Amino acid sequence: KDFKLNTQCSAGNGYFLQSTCVGFGFDVKEYADLAFAAKAMPMFGYGCAVFMQSDIVDFQRQGWQPEEIMAGLANVLPKNIWLYVSQIPNLASLGRTFILQGGTQHNLAAVKAQVDFIASRFKDKGTKPNVIVHEHCGESGAIGAALEVRRLYGRGQRTKFIGFEAVEKIRYLTHRNENTRCYFCKNKCMRTFIDVQI
């Protein structure tokens, strides 16, 4: 089966940056160089990528250039991650060391924005954060999952996977109505809830 990453949710920040870059006619590998070349950038509000997509259109109408818009998107990325998705405004409460992971960290504009944002959250804390980009940032999630499986297997825990034949027989119901509407931001998106019956 084909799987398509969600192109709208802010949890998919890397894909959003990539699709914006490609939409402007550039290869994603050019993103950082283009963003760093910008002399100014528009200020995006953080939150839902659907809303940010409409901001892109508005900024284009106002005359902002693609590289300036891409710089603005990279700049707002940490706010989406820490304030919108994770909802952790006090980063110092997590400790001093931050390891950035995920394929987005191949984009140096995104990395710089993360480092700057994290450092800004330590400004009056009397200490500085230690920000590290994982050596295998694009694969770090899979590496972590494999290490966790090995740890659990070593403790005698076995899989609860029901098998592919049983998976094909799973029944589910979807619900999409006013009761599933999200009020987390001003967009008030309609969500689909899926109830799985095994």
Predicted regions and their residues:
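Adenine-nucleotide phosphate-binding core of ATP-dependent small-molecule kinases
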Residues: S54-Y84
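Active-site nucleophile and cofactor-binding loops and adjacent substrate-binding regions
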Residues: K4-G12, G72-N75, I99-Q105, N130-A142
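Glycine-rich phosphate-binding/hydrolytic loop that grips phosphoryl groups
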Residues: G14-V22, I132-F164
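Acidic, glycine/GT-rich loop-and beta-edge segments that sit at the periphery of enzyme/chaperone cores
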Residues: E148-I198
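Short beta-alpha connecting loops at secondary-structure transitions
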Residues: D2-T7, R96, S120-H134, N177-E178
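Glycine-rich phosphate-binding loops at beta-strand->alpha-helix junctions
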Residues: V76, P89-R121, H136-G138
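Glycine-rich phosphate-binding loop plus the immediately following alpha-helix
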Residues: D2-A40, L147, R151, V196-Q197
